[in-house]
Amino acid sequence: METEGLTLDWNAHLPTVEVAYGLTKNSLKMWKSGTTATSDDYWLYTDGTVWNGVGVLGNNPETSTGFEKITPNFNASIKTYSASATDGQTDFNIPFTFSTITVFVNGSIQLPGLNYTVSGSTLTFTTELEAGDLLYVFIGNPNISTNDKLNRIYTANAMQGQTTIQVPYDFSTAIVYINGVLQNPITAYSIGADRIITFSEELYQDDEIIIMLGDIIIQSDEYVLKQELLDVNASSYINTKSGNSIQEEFDILYNSNSISKIIYSDIKNINWDEINEIFVCGKTLNTTEGAGYFYYDNNDTITVEDGGTCFVINNKRIKRRYIGPALSSWFTTIDGINTFLSTGNVSLRFDSNLTLTKALTIKSNTNLYFNKDVFLFPSGPTIQGLICSGSVSTTITTTLTSDVSSSSFIVNVTDASKFSVGDYVEIRSEKLVEGVNAQGVKIGIMRQITKIDANQLYIDKIALYDFTISDNTLISKMDIVKNVNIDGLTFNNINYTTLFPITMNMVYCDNIVIKNTQLYGSKEKYTGDVSGRTALKINSCRNVLIENCNAYHQGWYGVEILGYSEEVTVDKCFFDDCRHGVSINWSSIYGEPNGILINDCTSTSSTLSGFDTHDIGRNITFSNCRAYKSGDDGFQIRARNVKYINCLADYSTLDGFGQGDGAINTRLIGCKATNNGRNGFSLVWEGGNIEDCEALNNQYGYAMLGGRIINSRGIDNSSACVDCGSNSDPANQFSLYIDNCDFPYSTIQTRCLYFRGSSGIRPELVSVKNTNMAGYGNLWYLLGGYSSQPLSPMLNNNTLDINSTTAPTSGMVTLTAGTATINTSAVKLSTSSTASTLRYVSNIDLKRILSSSNIGTLSISNIVNGVSFTITSSNNLDASTIYWQISL
């Protein structure tokens, strides 16, 4: 048989040989050495005859090779070859003799002729591969048949929604691929009458269908074992290396209920020095869970067994061969998954539900993917979900030899030899962060070393703070977790029953991406806070993207960002029933968040504020975010340099946008506050800048200590449009500028400006110009709590009345004998000195439209509040036509 190209180390057996060479069934016998043959002998012997015209078999008995173990086809050995392509590579030399070949690139089947050709042992692709493309081939020798019909391939392109296809050839067997991916005949398709293949799901337009057809059904090894070798006329006890009969081996494999049981019960007895690779079936013959190819890696003596991708048998590392991510269903324990993850540089796809008895610990360069409708469940109240945790060394440290400025990239240290280029370091001091409410947090940053020159460390970003020797600055080496991608996690579910603390906890990390998550919390729906229970905690991490992540019913926060976290983006996320959807927090000893972007996120029904900047942090931006039905403020502002762009706060219990202690340099652009229980915008701590914003249907539209309101609107705010002094410390009041705003009267909004004397507010620090205050008349302001009349605000070019026939605010008049009296209720003059009133007078602009031959200087006199005013020329012969306009 060896001379004919059949080697027994492929586990060839007689019925297969008979089919391959077209011999009559049962014509080939297993003979022992000698000159005669009986059906009871088990060694091959050749008698010198011509074998069906194929060739002379020879005269010597083949005594060196015996049939030792015949493995069923669902667990059969197969010869494979794999390689990783270089960029532009097209040719691969296959180091085996073969007659048949099936080729995959990156897991997708390739079509002969269209995608590749074979010449001798050289496989040539029709297009260049890219660097890292993975080639995987199955090869056979010899061909099962010279009949082309056994190797026929039928291809087609699907129509949108197509579920059936009729093959135009007769066939008995079919192997089906969709877009190059092998389909499971149990779950993906079925074969019916009239050559019709029915798919279990609708196909998409132009899906590529590839069907490999066969005209005959070759008896499977399982059938041969049962029907040929194990009937009453055959030998039932052909021994295997384990000492069991083939039937016993088959029964063990058939009844094994997990991949690990198969490995430990059966495969541990295999001589892996002789066998290159085996295929192991899954839990049952009808499922593929755990199925795969395993090989002995004789170069590995250290990999730890994980029960899914590596098994240690007699100190040999038996490894799973696979392309793409490992599957969680391969592992039988959480410890096994953590062992697999412990090395880093791995990818894992969760393809079945998993109850966590402990947290999953993630290392650098790890990708985690989760199938749709797959859940991770916590098993108890102390179980966290996923942890990415680095550390800061307490021994590999050094100190400064000179102070470091906030803009510097260079750090001069006492001993740079402790560090290497590429190391991450923590730089921290005992100096508190800025702000009146620093909460004991001290300045700190994470940086990467880009260059070392003597005792100078060059860092990848500026220092941000002034680090000094006097503040006991310390530089410590860090062991961080970096380059982690988590995609599609669903943690817990809406019908949760188990309390747990944190779903994902990231500490000392760099370059983290978390996408497409559904994170259900651990408190009763729409009840109060449960401290310490957060969906995503980002502590002292850099370069983090959280995208399309949703969190529900969190006892504490949806996303919490703290420590010296930097360059963190939270994008397109949804938070329901959390204390805060996003909280910029202070609970780490060193460092404050910096450079944080919250974009296109929504919070609903938060226990307190929908979005919170909690006491510290700087350079934080909320863009296109929405807070609905917040239990406190929609957006709470207590950090430095916070910017809000095109955000909405609707139906908050208190303020739409509410400022607290610690807020400095707040800026709101294009934001909208509607239907909030107290203030639409409340900047009563450090003031701020409001531009192009709208306050609609709140109690007060704007509550301000100082700052600017520019190009903004205030409509239907029930108590007043602008409240000067609410919850303010008068000692901190500074100038408030209102310019080019639209604050009109309505039956709901009956006052434009409210000055709180009880808060000691000084109206003269308020300037209002170019603003529409039409409709209020003399009721444009309200004073409260003053014991004596305050000074009036500075007013310029504001519209106070709606232009009408009885109250015209502008018009033209021709002077008679140098004078004219205008009757209009729009003219205002307040001379009262009581504590509840302000003194003011209308500003009347005059412009000569048509001059007479005698002109003089124009002036206003005889203003009667709400009645009239007089225009007078210094020349009593002046008969010019004058345009007049009243403003406040």
Curated annotation (Swiss-Prot):
Q: Which family does it belong to?
A: Belongs to the K1-specific depolymerase family.
Q: Which GO terms describe its biological process?
A: adhesion receptor-mediated virion attachment to host cell; symbiont entry into host cell via disruption of host cell envelope; symbiont entry into host cell via disruption of host cell glycocalyx
The protein, known as: Depolymerase, capsule K1-specific
This protein's encoding gene = S2-4
Q: What does this protein do?
A: Functions as a receptor binding protein (RBP) and probably mediates the attachment to the host capsular exopolysaccharides. Displays a lyase activity that specifically degrades the K1-type polysaccharides of Klebsiella pneumoniae capsule.
Q: Transmembrane ranges? A: none
Name the source organism.
Answer: Klebsiella phage K64-1 (Bacteriophage K64-1)
The record's listing under SMART domains reads: PbH1 (SM00710)
Name the UniProt key words of this record, in alphabetical order.
Degradation of host capsule during virus entry, Degradation of host cell envelope components during virus entry, Host-virus interaction, Lyase, Viral attachment to host adhesion receptor, Viral attachment to host cell, Viral tail protein, Virion, Virus entry into host cell
* Record GO terms (molecular function): lyase activity
For this record, the Gene Ontology CC terms, alphabetical, are: virus tail
**Where does the protein end up?**
Virion
